[in-house]
Amino acid sequence: MPVHEIRHPLIRHKLGIMRRADLSTKSFRELSQEVGALLTYEASKDLPLAESTVEGWCGTVTVEKIAGKKVTVVPILRAGIGMLDGVLSLIPGAKVSVVGVARNEETLQAHTYLERLVGELDQRLALIVDPMLATGGSMLATIDMLKRAGCREIRALVLVAAPVGIKAVLDRHPDVHIYTASIDDGLNENGYIMPGLGDAGDRIFGTKQKAE
């Protein structure tokens, strides 16, 4: 099953704190990074390993290292930036591809306004990070872009997801695995995830939050 709802106690606890409406920008931002790191741990569990040797304090030691898998982290602007440092804390050597996708608040349709992708995407695992998977429009636009550029292995890391967004992604891209801290109930009339987290971008950057 390509949908992974990670119900680890640490993730459940941290996500519960993030749902508080009175949480400070600083705390929300820090928790976004922490949950992003925990999702990265789950999403990278099957990376291949190869044996190598290092000189240890008592002589040569056989160790394991990640083998032959280049990684690019793909934050969807702007809210995806809030999860980026959490991912890089575990995979510091990953290259970063940046994608800007905006949603029309009337039609809820996504349009791309920025594309800065790293090279050799055909040899890379792409980890897309975005706090919210709501209608799926931004995620679909990003996946489409990566595949056009030659990327063959894509995983999405989101804090909360709505069933309609998950279905939209899997209907078009059944090969993409989705890792989320929570599958929430659905969307309200404005396209916000319920109960969700509110506007994650506003909460991460401390800008004015839109009414739901």
Curated annotation (Swiss-Prot):
Co-factor binding comment: Binds 1 Mg(2+) ion per subunit. The magnesium is bound as Mg-PRPP.
Residues binding 5-phospho-alpha-D-ribose 1-diphosphate: 78, 103, 130-138, 199
Residues that bind uracil: 193, 198-200
EC top class, as a word: transferase
Alphabetic keyword roster: Allosteric enzyme, Glycosyltransferase, GTP-binding, Magnesium, Nucleotide-binding, Transferase
Cofactor: Mg(2+)
GO terms for MF: GTP binding; magnesium ion binding; uracil phosphoribosyltransferase activity
Keyword flag Cytoplasm: no
Pathway(s) it belongs to: Pyrimidine metabolism; UMP biosynthesis via salvage pathway; UMP from uracil: step 1/1
EC number: 2.4.2.9
CDD domains, per the entry: PRTases_typeI
Catalytic activity: UMP + diphosphate = 5-phospho-alpha-D-ribose 1-diphosphate + uracil
Pfam families (UniProt xref): UPRTase (PF14681)
Xref: HAMAP family: Upp_B (MF_01218_B)
Family: Belongs to the UPRTase family.
Protein name per its UniProtKB record: Uracil phosphoribosyltransferase
